[in-house]
Regions:
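Active-site neighborhood of divalent metal-dependent phosphoester bond hydrolases
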Residues: 49-56, 61-119
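N-terminal active-site segment of His-dependent metallophosphoesterases
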Residues: 1-58, 75
Length: 119
């Protein structure tokens, strides 16, 4: 068995698809498959790129069909922390919303949140 380790896609679905084709994956029935290899996605699917949701959909379909495995990266972890409150402590979000750090965090996640809202 051959494994292709792929990380830091950051919402660049078109580049991901080009890479998969270059590695020998073929799109059949809506997902990419390889005749003998498995893709191992090591996170950072979102932030920065223009097609973050499509990137997640490509990876999800591959995992669902058994042609890939995936783990969450720090960018996905940060997005979850942005939306999650700490009920055991202050009730604040796990990732700051206020102050200079909050402005940075909001900017980092805004493109993805906007893309989700447009669906």
């Amino acid at each position: 068995m051959t494994f292709h380790i792929i990380g830091d896609i950051h919402g660049h679905a078109e580049k991901l698809e080009a890479l998969l084709r270059k590695l020998g994956y073929v799109q059949t029935r809506g997902t990419y498959r390889h005749p003998y290899a498995t893709a191992i996605f090591v996170g950072d699917f979102i932030d920065r790129g223009p097609h973050q949701l499509e990137t997640l959909n490509i990876v999800r379909r591959m995992v669902d069909m058994g042609s890939a495995q995936a783990v969450m990266g720090n960018h996905e972890f940060n997005a979850i922390a942005w939306q999650t409150t700490d009920h055991d402590a202050t009730g604040e979000y796990l990732r700051p919303h206020g102050g200079p750090k909050g402005t940075h965090n909001r900017y980092q996640h805004q493109a993805f949140l906007t893309e989700l809202q447009n669906q």
